[in-house]
Swiss-Prot record:
GO cellular component: cytoplasm
Family annotation (SUPFAM superfamilies): Nucleotidyltransferase, PAP/OAS1 substrate-binding domain
Spans through the membrane: none
Gene Ontology MF annotations: ATP binding; metal ion binding; poly(A) RNA polymerase activity
Gene from which the chain derives: tent2
Catalytic activity from the UniProt record: RNA(n) + ATP = RNA(n)-3'-adenine ribonucleotide + diphosphate
Function of the molecule: Cytoplasmic poly(A) RNA polymerase that adds successive AMP monomers to the 3'-end of specific RNAs, forming a poly(A) tail. In contrast to the canonical nuclear poly(A) RNA polymerase, it only adds poly(A) to selected cytoplasmic mRNAs during oocyte maturation. Plays a central role during oocyte maturation by mediating polyadenylation of dormant mRNAs, which contain 5'AAUAAA-3' sequence in their 3'-UTR. In immature oocytes, polyadenylation of poly(A) tails is counteracted by the ribonuclease parn.
Record protein name field: Poly(A) RNA polymerase GLD2
Region (Disordered): 1-41, 99-121
GO biological process annotation, one example: oogenesis
Pfam families found in the cross-reference section: MTPAP-like_central, PAP_assoc
Swiss-Prot/TrEMBL cofactor(s): Mg(2+); Mn(2+)
Keyword Ubl conjugation appears in the UniProt entry: no
Organism whose genome encodes this protein: Xenopus tropicalis (Western clawed frog)
Annotated residues for binding of Mg(2+): 259, 261
Length: 528
């Protein structure tokens, strides 16, 4: 179980700086009202500041908050006065106001102490949430909060934490342009999962493997529960953020052992992945490592799209977390539509992924092909048959897959696209054989680009994205090369050789065992 989950009815683990506090008495005593600081009090507070922190760095609101907290939690007041802000759970600074009166001062106002000021080297990492508040406070929406909680409605930084008075951390408003949470509406919608009829031996083997390995609803629910729990944790640092499940867990091509991809969205605008995203992920990596007992082996990987990899001890699932890589949200629903538009697509793609994984072709971190690239290659093959099995959805339904569509519409737009009725009735076994043959001897790797967007092979241009690349697979939305990880001639030759070997073996034997020990894989998967 997740120790901080409110659904479990448990009090979260106390923070290191917390002390057990007696419960607040439900009496008729007068609520504590903020009192202005007397000169001698202010002097006493200032004397507690370290030499490296100038008194003007603390705003009047912080002094008011400290004076109130002094009556309720001595340890917390001492922590604030000693400027030990790293121990304070990060909370985005809200506007300050007294009930119905106008705000005293706004953190965004020119007079705010932290505005337009670089952090000095001797200040350490003081209040990084304030420094990074541009990621947390949307410009189009203003949320009013009660700045000084009274005794009857003291806020807590962590749900259920006992007697730890802080500024109330509000429920974050939904950012404009974001898709709904995966657990809210569409995640468990019924989709047509009718399988094709298999008459030959090879097609039956493919279907049997698919039915044993495909992701189950229970697997998806476990991942989504962890996503929801992590979203609550991350919103303690970035209150305006939303966390989305993307990739194979949602696009229909996942297996029971598939990793789960998460996209943390902080703002609508594109984010610099080299600077902003890395900074945010470094904060989250530290938070996961030090605060979350159910997160195991968090790793911060500084790739082109940086991620934090970790394992959830509760579900046993592996997760990859990125920040603001919103193209992943768009292509998740594009691929999901392809997955269910024709009933041969999912079984074929799954067996291709299992074959590639078994032979070491499915690991972008080791210079081979990512799962996403393999899916695009399979879809491209089905589009380029003399009688296509699937069309280009972006050409046939451009209004549903517009790259400029607001994110909150992305999941809804393709839901009413009907099944594609192809005249091509080729069985699964022949489609698998044709896929291997196409990339073994027919596709021109040196001259062509694989394009699902155009449903054909495009001639290579001299653009930097395609120049001197061994394999070129176009991302349907941002049109980058999803196969850029294959940058070594040795790895490219290995991939081509395996396609050729697999095609010859399957052509001669017409048995899935010639590609991989599929029954052993099924047995191993069922034991998980």
């Amino acid at each position: 179980m997740y120790p901080n989950s409110p659904s479990q009815g448990r009090i979260p683990l106390p923070l290191p700086c917390e002390q057990q506090q007696p419960p607040l008495e439900q009496s008729q005593e007068q609520p504590l009202q903020p009192q202005p600081l007397q000169p001698q009090q202010a002097s006493g507070y200032l004397s507690k500041l370290p030499v490296s922190v100038a008194p003007e760095l603390l705003s009047p609101e912080q002094f008011i908050q400290a004076s109130i907290n002094l009556h309720n939690n001595v340890n917390f007041a001492r922590m604030l006065m000693n400027a030990n802000l790293l121990a304070v759970p990060p909370v985005s600074p809200p506007p300050w106001s007294y009930r119905d009166q106008s705000p005293l001062i706004s953190p965004a106002s020119p007079s705010s102490s932290f505005q337009n000021r670089k952090r000095r080297s001797d200040e350490g990492n003081i209040a990084y949430d304030v420094k990074r508040q541009k990621f947390q406070s949307p410009q189009e929406q203003t949320v009013n909060h009660q700045a000084v909680p009274l005794r009857g409605d003291l806020g807590c930084s962590y749900p259920g934490s006992p007697a730890f008075p802080l500024l109330q951390s509000p429920s974050p408003p939904v950012l404009k342009g974001h898709v709904p949470n995966s657990g809210e509406c569409w995640l468990y919608d019924h989709v047509d999962t009718t399988l094709p009829v298999a008459k030959d031996k090879l097609s039956k083997q493919i279907l049997e493997l698919f039915q044993a390995l495909q992701q189950q609803v229970c697997d998806l629910k476990k991942k989504d529960i962890c996503r929801a729990e992590l979203q609550r944790e991350i919103q303690q640092i970035f209150p305006q953020s939303r966390l989305y499940l993307v990739g194979s867990s949602l696009n229909g091509f996942g297996t029971r052992s598939s990793d789960a991809d998460l996209c943390l969205v902080l703002k609508d605008e594109p984010m610099n992945q080299h600077t902003e995203a890395r900074h945010i992920l470094s904060l989250l990596h530290k938070h996961f490592y030090t605060r979350l007992s159910y997160i195991e082996r968090p790793q911060f990987i500084k790739a082109k799209v940086p991620i934090v990899k970790f394992r959830d001890k509760v579900s046993g699932a592996e997760f990859d977390l990125n920040v603001n890589n919103v193209v992943g949200i768009r292509n998740t629903f594009l691929l999901r539509t392809y997955a269910y538009i024709e009933n041969r697509v999912r079984p074929l793609v799954l067996v291709i992924k299992m074959w590639a994984n078994y032979h070491g072709l499915n690991d972008a971190s080791r210079g081979t092909l990512s799962s996403y690239t393999l899916v695009l290659m399979a879809l491209h093959y089905l589009q380029t048959l003399p009688e296509p099995i699937i069309p280009s959805l972006q050409k046939k339904y451009p209004e549903c897959f517009d790259s400029t569509m607001q994110l909150h519409l992305v999941h809804h737009a393709p839901r009413n696209i009907p099944k594609y009725l192809s005249k091509n009735e080729t069985p699964l076994g022949d489609l698998l054989l044709g896929f291997l043959k196409y990339f073994a001897i027919e596709f021109d790797w040196s001259k062509d680009i694989i394009s699902v967007r155009e449903a054909k092979a495009l001639p290579r241009s001299d653009d930097y994205e395609w120049r001197n690349k061994f394999i070129c697979v176009e991302e349907p939305y941002d049109r980058t090369n999803t196969a850029r990880a294959v940058y070594e001639r040795q790895k490219f030759d290995m991939i081509r050789a395996e396609f050729l070997r697999a095609w010859v073996a399957l052509r001669d034997n017409r048995d899935l065992y010639s590609l991989l020990p599929w029954k052993g894989i099924m047995k191993k998967m069922n034991s998980l």
